[in-house]
Amino acid sequence: MLTSSIARAAAAHVGVDGARARFATEQLTFLLQLAYSGELAAIRAYLGHRASLKDRAQRRAIDRIIRDEVRHRHCVLGQLAELGAGPIAARERKMERVGRGISTFCLVGGWFAPMYGAGRLEAQNIREYEVAARLALVAERPRFVDPLLEMAEVEWDHEHWFRAMATAHPAWRVFPKWRQPPPREEIRASFAAFERSTDRPLHVVRAPWLVR
Protein backbone atom coordinates (compact mmCIF):
# COMPACT_ATOMS: atom_id res chain seq x y z
CA MET A 1 0.00 0.00 0.00
CA LEU A 2 2.82 2.37 0.91
CA THR A 3 4.65 1.54 -2.31
CA SER A 4 1.47 2.12 -4.30
CA SER A 5 0.91 5.49 -2.62
CA ILE A 6 4.46 6.54 -3.38
CA ALA A 7 4.06 5.47 -6.99
CA ARG A 8 0.82 7.43 -7.34
CA ALA A 9 2.42 10.49 -5.77
CA ALA A 10 5.42 10.19 -8.08
CA ALA A 11 3.16 9.82 -11.11
CA ALA A 12 1.15 12.87 -10.06
CA HIS A 13 4.37 14.83 -9.60
CA VAL A 14 5.59 13.83 -13.05
CA GLY A 15 2.21 14.78 -14.48
CA VAL A 16 2.34 18.24 -12.93
CA ASP A 17 5.93 18.76 -14.08
CA GLY A 18 5.00 17.60 -17.57
CA ALA A 19 2.08 20.01 -17.73
CA ARG A 20 4.30 22.87 -16.54
CA ALA A 21 6.92 22.00 -19.14
CA ARG A 22 4.31 21.96 -21.90
CA PHE A 23 2.86 25.29 -20.77
CA ALA A 24 6.35 26.80 -20.52
CA THR A 25 7.12 25.56 -24.04
CA GLU A 26 3.97 27.21 -25.40
CA GLN A 27 4.77 30.50 -23.68
CA LEU A 28 8.43 30.36 -24.69
CA THR A 29 7.50 29.75 -28.32
CA PHE A 30 5.15 32.73 -28.38
CA LEU A 31 7.66 34.97 -26.61
CA LEU A 32 10.38 34.04 -29.09
CA GLN A 33 8.01 34.76 -31.97
CA LEU A 34 7.34 38.20 -30.48
CA ALA A 35 11.06 38.79 -29.92
CA TYR A 36 11.95 37.72 -33.45
CA SER A 37 9.56 40.21 -35.04
CA GLY A 38 10.44 42.85 -32.45
CA GLU A 39 14.07 42.61 -33.51
CA LEU A 40 12.98 43.22 -37.11
CA ALA A 41 11.22 46.43 -36.07
CA ALA A 42 14.31 47.47 -34.11
CA ILE A 43 16.64 46.88 -37.06
CA ARG A 44 14.44 48.93 -39.38
CA ALA A 45 14.09 51.71 -36.81
CA TYR A 46 17.82 51.86 -36.07
CA LEU A 47 18.66 52.18 -39.75
CA GLY A 48 16.67 55.41 -39.81
CA HIS A 49 18.10 56.46 -36.46
CA ARG A 50 21.66 55.99 -37.72
CA ALA A 51 20.92 57.98 -40.88
CA SER A 52 19.60 60.86 -38.78
CA LEU A 53 22.81 61.27 -36.76
CA LYS A 54 25.65 63.61 -37.65
CA ASP A 55 28.08 62.47 -34.96
CA ARG A 56 30.32 59.70 -36.32
CA ALA A 57 30.86 58.02 -32.95
CA GLN A 58 27.12 57.85 -32.39
CA ARG A 59 26.60 56.41 -35.87
CA ARG A 60 29.22 53.73 -35.16
CA ALA A 61 27.48 52.88 -31.88
CA ILE A 62 24.15 52.45 -33.67
CA ASP A 63 25.92 50.29 -36.28
CA ARG A 64 27.09 47.96 -33.51
CA ILE A 65 23.60 47.84 -32.04
CA ILE A 66 22.11 46.96 -35.44
CA ARG A 67 24.60 44.09 -35.80
CA ASP A 68 23.65 42.85 -32.34
CA GLU A 69 19.95 42.87 -33.23
CA VAL A 70 20.64 40.95 -36.45
CA ARG A 71 22.56 38.31 -34.46
CA HIS A 72 19.69 38.10 -31.98
CA ARG A 73 17.25 37.48 -34.80
CA HIS A 74 19.37 34.63 -36.14
CA CYS A 75 19.69 33.09 -32.67
CA VAL A 76 15.96 33.33 -31.93
CA LEU A 77 15.10 31.86 -35.33
CA GLY A 78 17.29 28.85 -34.57
CA GLN A 79 15.58 28.35 -31.23
CA LEU A 80 12.15 28.55 -32.83
CA ALA A 81 13.21 25.90 -35.33
CA GLU A 82 14.27 23.61 -32.47
CA LEU A 83 10.82 24.09 -30.95
CA GLY A 84 9.22 23.09 -34.24
CA ALA A 85 7.89 26.60 -34.81
CA GLY A 86 8.68 29.64 -36.91
CA PRO A 87 7.89 33.34 -37.20
CA ILE A 88 4.30 34.58 -37.36
CA ALA A 89 3.96 35.98 -40.88
CA ALA A 90 1.30 38.55 -39.98
CA ARG A 91 3.39 39.80 -37.10
CA GLU A 92 6.46 40.08 -39.31
CA ARG A 93 4.51 42.30 -41.69
CA LYS A 94 3.15 44.41 -38.86
CA MET A 95 6.53 44.93 -37.19
CA GLU A 96 8.12 45.72 -40.55
CA ARG A 97 5.62 48.58 -40.87
CA VAL A 98 6.20 49.67 -37.27
CA GLY A 99 9.96 49.71 -37.77
CA ARG A 100 9.75 51.68 -41.00
CA GLY A 101 7.40 54.16 -39.36
CA ILE A 102 9.81 54.73 -36.50
CA SER A 103 12.67 54.98 -38.99
CA THR A 104 10.88 57.79 -40.81
CA PHE A 105 10.14 59.55 -37.53
CA CYS A 106 13.84 59.41 -36.59
CA LEU A 107 14.66 61.40 -39.73
CA VAL A 108 12.35 64.26 -38.74
CA GLY A 109 11.93 63.92 -34.97
CA GLY A 110 15.14 65.52 -33.78
CA TRP A 111 17.97 64.03 -31.75
CA PHE A 112 16.45 63.42 -28.32
CA ALA A 113 13.19 61.58 -29.02
CA PRO A 114 14.78 58.61 -30.87
CA MET A 115 17.41 58.20 -28.13
CA TYR A 116 14.76 58.38 -25.42
CA GLY A 117 12.36 56.00 -27.16
CA ALA A 118 15.08 53.47 -27.94
CA GLY A 119 16.21 53.44 -24.32
CA ARG A 120 12.70 52.71 -23.08
CA LEU A 121 12.27 49.86 -25.55
CA GLU A 122 15.66 48.32 -24.80
CA ALA A 123 14.78 48.28 -21.09
CA GLN A 124 11.75 46.14 -21.94
CA ASN A 125 13.89 43.85 -24.10
CA ILE A 126 16.16 43.02 -21.16
CA ARG A 127 13.22 41.65 -19.22
CA GLU A 128 11.86 39.85 -22.28
CA TYR A 129 14.99 37.74 -22.67
CA GLU A 130 15.24 37.15 -18.92
CA VAL A 131 11.70 35.75 -18.93
CA ALA A 132 12.54 33.64 -21.98
CA ALA A 133 15.50 32.10 -20.14
CA ARG A 134 13.29 31.16 -17.19
CA LEU A 135 10.68 29.65 -19.48
CA ALA A 136 13.39 27.70 -21.30
CA LEU A 137 14.56 26.21 -18.01
CA VAL A 138 11.07 25.02 -17.06
CA ALA A 139 10.44 23.87 -20.65
CA GLU A 140 13.49 21.60 -20.32
CA ARG A 141 15.46 23.47 -22.98
CA PRO A 142 18.68 24.10 -21.02
CA ARG A 143 20.70 24.81 -24.18
CA PHE A 144 18.59 27.91 -24.75
CA VAL A 145 19.36 29.46 -21.37
CA ASP A 146 22.86 30.84 -21.87
CA PRO A 147 22.17 32.44 -25.29
CA LEU A 148 19.01 34.06 -23.90
CA LEU A 149 20.83 35.45 -20.87
CA GLU A 150 23.61 36.71 -23.14
CA MET A 151 21.02 38.51 -25.28
CA ALA A 152 19.55 40.06 -22.13
CA GLU A 153 23.04 41.32 -21.23
CA VAL A 154 23.52 42.82 -24.69
CA GLU A 155 20.15 44.56 -24.44
CA TRP A 156 21.32 45.89 -21.06
CA ASP A 157 24.35 47.38 -22.82
CA HIS A 158 22.06 48.99 -25.41
CA GLU A 159 19.80 50.49 -22.76
CA HIS A 160 22.81 51.78 -20.85
CA TRP A 161 24.12 53.58 -23.94
CA PHE A 162 20.79 55.10 -24.93
CA ARG A 163 20.16 56.21 -21.34
CA ALA A 164 23.56 57.90 -21.22
CA MET A 165 22.75 59.72 -24.45
CA ALA A 166 19.26 60.76 -23.37
CA THR A 167 20.24 61.93 -19.89
CA ALA A 168 22.83 64.28 -21.40
CA HIS A 169 20.04 66.23 -23.15
CA PRO A 170 18.13 69.05 -21.37
CA ALA A 171 14.80 67.48 -22.38
CA TRP A 172 15.51 64.53 -20.11
CA ARG A 173 14.55 66.64 -17.10
CA VAL A 174 10.96 67.05 -18.26
CA PHE A 175 10.24 63.65 -19.84
CA PRO A 176 8.85 60.70 -17.81
CA LYS A 177 11.62 58.40 -16.64
CA TRP A 178 11.59 54.64 -17.11
CA ARG A 179 12.90 52.46 -14.33
CA GLN A 180 16.64 51.96 -14.45
CA PRO A 181 17.46 48.25 -14.83
CA PRO A 182 19.36 46.52 -12.01
CA PRO A 183 23.13 46.11 -12.45
CA ARG A 184 24.16 43.95 -15.41
CA GLU A 185 25.46 41.14 -13.20
CA GLU A 186 22.01 40.83 -11.65
CA ILE A 187 20.74 39.23 -14.88
CA ARG A 188 22.70 36.05 -14.17
CA ALA A 189 22.35 36.29 -10.40
CA SER A 190 18.56 36.52 -10.53
CA PHE A 191 18.40 33.60 -12.96
CA ALA A 192 20.56 31.52 -10.63
CA ALA A 193 18.18 32.32 -7.77
CA PHE A 194 15.24 31.27 -9.96
CA GLU A 195 17.02 28.04 -10.85
CA ARG A 196 17.61 27.22 -7.17
CA SER A 197 14.04 28.02 -6.18
CA THR A 198 11.45 25.30 -5.65
CA ASP A 199 8.76 27.78 -6.68
CA ARG A 200 9.34 28.79 -10.29
CA PRO A 201 6.41 30.99 -11.36
CA LEU A 202 5.52 30.81 -15.04
CA HIS A 203 4.79 33.94 -17.04
CA VAL A 204 1.80 34.26 -19.31
CA VAL A 205 3.14 35.99 -22.42
CA ARG A 206 1.08 38.72 -24.05
CA ALA A 207 1.89 40.88 -27.04
CA PRO A 208 2.53 44.56 -26.17
CA TRP A 209 -0.82 46.33 -26.45
CA LEU A 210 0.53 49.02 -28.79
CA VAL A 211 1.37 46.48 -31.49
CA ARG A 212 -1.22 43.75 -31.02
Task: Identify the function of each model-found stretch.
Residues 1-212:
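Non-heme di-metal
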